């Protein structure tokens, strides 16, 4: 839950399952309330400026922060440890991934790929994406400071004493 610039509170979530409109293949949904402890009402989904659902990369496990009036949405998921697949395997498995993630073969096999931790800035309406998606942690972590703690899911963002902390579940699940 995050307080918008309008003083209302916004809850971001992903629906899963056949009856939901999200999960691994849909948009991030938004609910709104006048107080942080509910009762929230469905507002809509995070969308592009043209009104279409925002679905760059895999939209999953959203977290939002109001950073001095700038609304930032963090989201994403990746393959579990041991399942980070080379490009040729992604290409061969793309029909399965297309169904699970609702992404095209081109999106799945291209670089940087559909998996990873990402961020966008939202407009004051708390739904419309203002900036292009940016990958904040590399999917391929070998040789980086993330090598032992590659991103899996569970985006959470904090700002403490002017420093940002991105907290997540790693592929080692800790």
Language-model features: locations:
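Carbohydrate-active catalytic/glycan-binding domains of CAZyme proteins
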Residues: 1-174
